[in-house]
Amino acid sequence: MYTPPVQRRNFLTSTLGAALMSTMAASGNRADAAQPTGAKVAPEFYVWRQYILKNGTQPRRLADFLQNAAIPALNRLGHTPIGVFEVMAGLPSPTLFVLTPSSSLESLLAIEAGLERDDAFMRAADPYLNAPATDPVYLRQELSLLTAFPNVPRVEVPAATAAKGPRLFELRTYESHNERAHRAKVRMFTDMGEVDIFRKVGLTPVFFARTFVGPRMPSLVYMLVHENMAGREKSWDAFRTSPDWKTLAATPGFSDAEIVTNITTVFLRPAAYSQI
């Protein structure tokens, strides 16, 4: 959502910011723009934002801001779909996550200016923007900048979203002990067929991404969607017993013991107004 100007300037002048700008420049236009036949879809960038809240009025006030001010304005700026997720298990509650996709880093950095020029947003966001320090809308925010895997280049909206059907989201973070190990794990998903195995056994992706900026690096993050917990267990059981997975996991240099130091799982449910 909102990026303070000083943080934006610091980011742009950093070495990492320059590298990401180069990546962005090479990524081209949105995937839904006209593409040459056979052209690859450029991977998206994601802002993954965590709001830490306290019980009381904060969850309702933040939801009002997101639903009535932020999400409509972000959609007008071309950022869609916006995912909003509430924690079911794995983290303290109340905690809210917001996923903002973008075709480029440049468009993410332009969000602040775009919102400030949007009169409808400024009116709808007034209770949020003018909340006093003694009664804030949230305790704090934490965010990560992610870049999508080339073989899962865009958010895949679950089929159940349109009908507001049941959706259990599973957010998984894989940490590695160094950059080489991290690249090896990413390669398993992007080049060695692990995502294909997921799909084959019924593990349905929402997104797969590398963490470019954020905590617990080097790491990758992905989200799956299930109908319910029983469906999740069935799909994971099928994955663990898959001959394809057993062969891949036994590849020298690619076992979890060699390249993954920690896996974190958080279960989420969609907010009523989530677009994912």
Where are these regions (language model features)?
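Short, glycine- and small/hydrophobic-rich beta-strand elements in well-ordered beta-sheets
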Residues: 29-41, 71-97, 103, 193-221, ...
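Acidic/histidine-rich, surface-exposed loop or edge segments in extracytoplasmic proteins
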Residues: 43-54
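Surface-exposed interaction/gating patches
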Residues: 148-229
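Short, low-complexity, Pro/Ser/Thr/Gly-rich segments in the mature regions of secreted, periplasmic
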Residues: 269-275
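Hydrophobic, ordered structural segments
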Residues: 52-62, 68-76, 80-162, 176-178, ...
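N-terminal secretory signal peptides and thylakoid transit peptides that target proteins
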Residues: 1-19
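Hydrophobic h-region of N-terminal signal peptides that target proteins for export
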Residues: 20-25
